[in-house]
Curated annotation (Swiss-Prot):
Organism of this sequence: Burkholderia pseudomallei (strain K96243)
Enzyme Commission numbers on file: 1.2.1.8
Residues annotated for NAD(+) binding in this entry: G150, A151, W152, K176, P177, S178, E179, G229, V230, E231, T232, G253, C285, E386
Gene name tied to this protein: betB
Keyword Oxidoreductase: yes
Modification type Cysteine sulfenic acid (-SOH): residues: C285
Protein name as catalogued: Betaine aldehyde dehydrogenase
This protein's record includes keyword NADP: yes
A GO MF label: betaine-aldehyde dehydrogenase (NAD+) activity
Subunit structure as annotated in this protein's UniProt entry: Dimer of dimers.
Superkingdom classification of source: Bacteria
Positions bound to K(+) 2: L245, K456, G459
Length: 489
């Protein structure tokens, strides 16, 4: 018997049965309890979703921008009214502490919808004079039907981040949440419908990567926005291009450097490093997992980090005092433990954690102790590859040039940060770091106003910020001739 029963698709403004005959299960990562059995979409279901999205998008785009803005603002109100209930659902599905899901997941999703609701009326074109008798004007028009493919670490936040700019610009979206955390996207769909979004404008299709592939290759979809791993992102991008040259936004993985210089406030630096590695049990794409520390302050910094790690409160996600929960799935647990074993085998010095937690109530959950490795080398797997778990690697350095060169020696380029009291060095270093999201003397905040996305293999395009609206519209140029037409022949 599951907690939430059978979960269906959401198409054309209502829950709908899938036609595949297939289902998959989703579990509470803290207890192993069966949360729900979820119907998997078929190719026919994806076709249904696209057809309803096309119909709904025509109605949605025909509304005035102010009408769309008001409806999106109503969705924001409903999200905030139901914050606690949605936070509990997200806690059960992801394993995150309730204190975190109440304060972050729904709140930041609602903030982004509110932000784009305010910008919906600001989508405008340009007027370009050519000569006294002729001018050009441009229109920013919606793309049509967009697909959003989410990751399992921030299910409802990602659904909001992808749908908000799409809907604000007059598009429809078909969203596929991760099969690991599939529940909250359905609640967002219900809220959009209740707020007045026309049927079909936000559909949810459930399933594994095969459903994502169907969306990526579908000729009726104009854009795909994907959040997930690099290799899967490359497959999505390939399908999107080969099928119909779709627009793409890719928010992919990272192996982000945090550089602590010898003039840094070490207490502040330790606070930043611990947050940048252990928030959400390390399951954050922007985590600063490569911590470069200037040699002169390394020992003092490590001492402060370990003191803070010892204060982390690992526990049941439902306990308001817990600030560190389980990993999201058994597969992720095995992956993280494999990397920890690799770090030990390659000679990294284990300073904290390094094992699965199995005592008391941890036994049935996917818990790994917050882990810190010292004296790491750049060639170690734990330093080179994205782990997506609570594993910090500390790497000593001598000079600024050395730190920058080593920080940039990666195929990733999602995030980076520096901690220093020297303003000139802070900006100089940040300008040399090859990353799309950077922080000085802080880490992790990604407000609605801030464009986020990666360099190199960490992504294409941006989410959030004004610039993202450009990625959900296309420009139509119109020349107007007021004078006599001059024939060529």
């Amino acid at each position: 018997m599951s907690v939430y029963g059978l979960q269906r698709l959401y198409i054309a403004g209502a829950h709908a049965d899938a036609t595949s005959g297939k289902t998959f299960d989703t579990f509470d990562p803290a207890t192993g309890e069966l949360l729900a059995r979820v119907q998997q979409a078929s190719a026919d279901d994806v076709d249904r979703a696209v057809a309803s999205a096309r119909e709904g998008q025509r109605e949605w785009a025909a509304m005035t921008a102010m009408q769309r803005s008001r409806i999106l603002r109503r969705a924001v109100e409903l999200l905030r009214e139901r914050n606690d209930a949605l936070a509990e659902l997200e806690m059960r599905d992801t394993g995150k502490p309730i204190a975190e899901t109440r304060a972050v997941d729904i709140v930041t999703g609602a903030d982004v919808i509110e932000y784009y609701a305010g910008l919906a009326t600001a989508i405008e074109g340009l007027q370009v004079p050519l000569r006294p008798e002729s001018f050009v004007y441009t229109r920013r028009e919606p793309l049509g039907v967009c697909a959003g493919i989410g990751a399992w670490n921030y299910p409802i936040q990602i659904a909001c981040w992808k749908s908000a700019p799409a809907l604000a610009a007059g598009n429809a979206m078909i969203f596929k949440p991760s099969e690991v955390t599939p529940l909250s996207a359905l609640k967002l769909a219900e809220i959009y419908t209740e707020a007045g979004v026309p049927a079909g404008v936000f559909n949810v299709v459930q399933g594994d990567g095969s459903v994502g592939a169907l969306l990526s290759a579908h000729p009726g979809i104009a854009k795909v926005s994907f959040t997930g791993g690099v290799e899967t992102g490359k497959k999505v991008m390939s399908l999107a291009g080969a099928s119909s040259l779709k627009e793409v936004t890719m928010e992919l993985g990272g192996k982000s450097p945090l550089i602590v210089f010898d003039d840094a406030d070490l207490d502040r630096a330790a606070d930043i490093a611990v947050t940048a590695n252990f928030f959400s049990a390390g399951q954050v794409c922007t985590n600063g997992t490569r911590v470069f520390v200037q040699q002169a302050v390394k020992d003092a910094f490590v001492e402060r980090v370990l003191a803070r790690v010892a204060r982390i409160r690992v526990g049941k996600p439902s306990d308001p005092d817990t600030n560190f929960g389980p990993l999201a799935s058994a597969a992720q647990l095995d992956k993280v433990l494999g990397y920890i074993d690799s770090g030990k085998a390659e000679g990294a010095k284990l300073l904290a954690g390094g094992a699965r937690l199995v005592n008391d109530h941890f036994a049935s959950g996917q818990y790994v102790a917050p882990t810190v490795f010292g004296d790491c080398r750049d060639d170690m797997r734990i330093v080179r590859e994205e782990i997506f778990g609570p594993v910090m690697s500390i790497l000593p350095f001598e000079t600024e040039d050395e730190a920058i060169a080593r920080a940039n020696a990666t195929d990733y380029g999602l995030a980076a940060g520096v901690v220093t009291e020297n303003l000139s060095r802070a900006h100089r270093a940040i300008h040399r770091l090859e990353a799309g999201i950077c922080w000085i003397n802080t880490w992790g905040e990604s407000p609605a106003e801030m464009p986020v996305g990666g360099y190199k293999q960490s992504g294409v395009g941006r989410e959030n910020g004004i610039t993202t609206l450009e990625h959900y519209t296309r420009i139509k140029s119109v020349q107007v001739e007021l004078g006599r037409y001059q024939p060529v022949f």
